[in-house]
Amino acid sequence: MEQPQPAPGSLSWRLSSHPITLLTFLGFRVSSLLVYLFGLLFTDNLVMIFIITILLLAADFYYLKNIAGRRLVGLRWWNEVDPSTGDSHWVFESSEPGSKVINATDSRFFWIAIYAQPLFWIALAVVAVFSFKFIWLPLVAIALVLTITNSLAFSRCDKFSQASNIAGSAFNGGNLAGSIASNMVGRFFTR
């Protein structure tokens, strides 16, 4: 008997447009948490757990910022520094509105994972404080900085993308009206 297919947008990686990208993204998101939580079961070396967790967090940050965000939801961001003034600002990039169709499953996985991970790290910070294991707080602080930075940047990037799409459609609509008006005026003077 054939099993029913999951509905589009449901949390099934099989519906993903980019399953390898999605699974790698989720693997990086989960691996740093797993090493932090269960690393002491395999080794008593706190420094090794610290280093492995930091490396996994850095890989997650890079992969999310440069690969997964672009492929899964069509968004990318980076920080630019003006060499003459030294001012830095964030630059947001989104795919063209008609050029890429965003898969609902990819989008749901992406946004759930991007907002859930900082919440997990906040919970782990609370656990570290209340269990008096302050040695873990620097690691949790680094994890929070990296995950919250990506969360904020992609949230702003998404808002920028939506605003650009609205402005672009209004601008294109204005061009259409302008071209119709200029054609009508042009015809009037050529007669």
From Swiss-Prot:
One of its GO terms (cellular component) is Golgi membrane. It comes from the Eukaryota. It holds the Pfam family DUF846. It is found in: Golgi apparatus membrane. Keywords: Glycoprotein, Golgi apparatus, Membrane, Transmembrane, Transmembrane helix. One of its GO terms (biological process) is vesicle-mediated transport. Glycans are attached at N103. It is a multi-pass membrane protein. Its main location: Golgi. The chain crosses the membrane at residues 15-35, 37-57, 109-129, 134-154. PANTHER family: GOLGI APPARATUS MEMBRANE PROTEIN TVP23. Golgi membrane protein involved in vesicular trafficking. Belongs to the TVP23 family. This is Golgi apparatus membrane protein TVP23. It comes from Podospora anserina (strain S / ATCC MYA-4624 / DSM 980 / FGSC 10383) (Pleurage anserina).
